[in-house]
């Protein structure tokens, strides 16, 4: 009987060790299953608040901001927080992009090593105040259209998991003055569809496909 008891003890110990080894993975799985997917709606115009704490550069020492702006939460700060949650990738498909705060957030993600890709409209990227030139100067990949229609999308995809979309152009005018809406949705199917659209446009706007004399080409 002693050998049998010894074998039972060994099996029990091995089972316990296996259970302890797999417990963290099981707990993570249960947490993911129980966690509610993100569903958030933001309305604009946004209250003007200080966003310096969110946009602090990597390695910067935390310090209180002396500005006179309110330091509470706003629609803009919540949008910034959703963007800055990116750890791996950020796809942006934007008609107009001139907000300095949102531009700083995108550059900050690039500095952190997040892969950022931007698709925008060729006419609006050339306007005064556009952030597109600064993004390109920082080394961020940007592509634009070359046709008569507008690239009028307004969406972002964070880590291929979270979709941010709505009526909002990423401009100070829209953020502070216009009545706009933004949806922040964690939904696999919606993200997949928008990501497919982004990849389709990204490939269509590949600069190697461009004609530098489109008017002459059409005249032929």
Curated annotation (Swiss-Prot):
<feature type="region of interest" description="Required for mitochondrial localization">
    <location>
        <begin position="1"/>
        <end position="39"/>
    </location>
</feature>
<keyword id="KW-0539">Nucleus</keyword>
<dbReference type="GO" id="GO:0016042">
    <property type="term" value="P:lipid catabolic process"/>
</dbReference>
<keyword id="KW-0862">Zinc</keyword>
<dbReference type="InterPro" id="IPR025202">
    <property type="entry name" value="PLD-like_dom"/>
</dbReference>
<keyword id="KW-0378">Hydrolase</keyword>
<comment type="similarity">
    <text>Belongs to the phospholipase D family. MitoPLD/Zucchini subfamily.</text>
</comment>
<keyword id="KW-1133">Transmembrane helix</keyword>
<feature type="topological domain" description="Mitochondrial intermembrane">
    <location>
        <begin position="1"/>
        <end position="9"/>
    </location>
</feature>
<dbReference type="GO" id="GO:0034587">
    <property type="term" value="P:piRNA processing"/>
</dbReference>
<dbReference type="GO" id="GO:0030719">
    <property type="term" value="P:P granule organization"/>
</dbReference>
<dbReference type="GO" id="GO:0005794">
    <property type="term" value="C:Golgi apparatus"/>
</dbReference>
<dbReference type="GO" id="GO:0016891">
    <property type="term" value="F:RNA endonuclease activity, producing 5'-phosphomonoesters"/>
</dbReference>
<feature type="active site">
    <location>
        <position position="159"/>
    </location>
</feature>
<keyword id="KW-0863">Zinc-finger</keyword>
<keyword id="KW-0472">Membrane</keyword>
<dbReference type="InterPro" id="IPR001736">
    <property type="entry name" value="PLipase_D/transphosphatidylase"/>
</dbReference>
<keyword id="KW-1003">Cell membrane</keyword>
<feature type="active site">
    <location>
        <position position="152"/>
    </location>
</feature>
<dbReference type="InterPro" id="IPR051406">
    <property type="entry name" value="PLD_domain"/>
</dbReference>
<comment type="subunit">
    <text>Homodimer. Interacts with MOV10L1. Interacts with MIGA1 and MIGA2; possibly facilitating homodimer formation. Interacts with GK2.</text>
</comment>
<keyword id="KW-0442">Lipid degradation</keyword>
<feature type="topological domain" description="Cytoplasmic">
    <location>
        <begin position="33"/>
        <end position="220"/>
    </location>
</feature>
<keyword id="KW-0333">Golgi apparatus</keyword>
<dbReference type="Pfam" id="PF13091">
    <property type="entry name" value="PLDc_2"/>
</dbReference>
<feature type="active site">
    <location>
        <position position="154"/>
    </location>
</feature>
<dbReference type="GO" id="GO:0008270">
    <property type="term" value="F:zinc ion binding"/>
</dbReference>
<feature type="transmembrane region" description="Helical">
    <location>
        <begin position="10"/>
        <end position="32"/>
    </location>
</feature>
<keyword id="KW-0540">Nuclease</keyword>
<keyword id="KW-0443">Lipid metabolism</keyword>
<keyword id="KW-0744">Spermatogenesis</keyword>
<dbReference type="GO" id="GO:0042803">
    <property type="term" value="F:protein homodimerization activity"/>
</dbReference>
<keyword id="KW-0479">Metal-binding</keyword>
<keyword id="KW-0812">Transmembrane</keyword>
<feature type="zinc finger region" description="C3H1-type; atypical">
    <location>
        <begin position="45"/>
        <end position="74"/>
    </location>
</feature>
<dbReference type="GO" id="GO:0051321">
    <property type="term" value="P:meiotic cell cycle"/>
</dbReference>
<dbReference type="GO" id="GO:0005886">
    <property type="term" value="C:plasma membrane"/>
</dbReference>
<keyword id="KW-0496">Mitochondrion</keyword>
<keyword id="KW-0255">Endonuclease</keyword>
<feature type="domain" description="PLD phosphodiesterase">
    <location>
        <begin position="147"/>
        <end position="174"/>
    </location>
</feature>
<dbReference type="GO" id="GO:0005739">
    <property type="term" value="C:mitochondrion"/>
</dbReference>
<comment type="function">
    <text>Presents phospholipase and nuclease activities, depending on the different physiological conditions. Interaction with Mitoguardin (MIGA1 or MIGA2) affects the dimer conformation, facilitating the lipase activity over the nuclease activity. Plays a key role in mitochondrial fusion and fission via its phospholipase activity. In its phospholipase role, it uses the mitochondrial lipid cardiolipin as substrate to generate phosphatidate (PA or 1,2-diacyl-sn-glycero-3-phosphate), a second messenger signaling lipid.</text>
</comment>
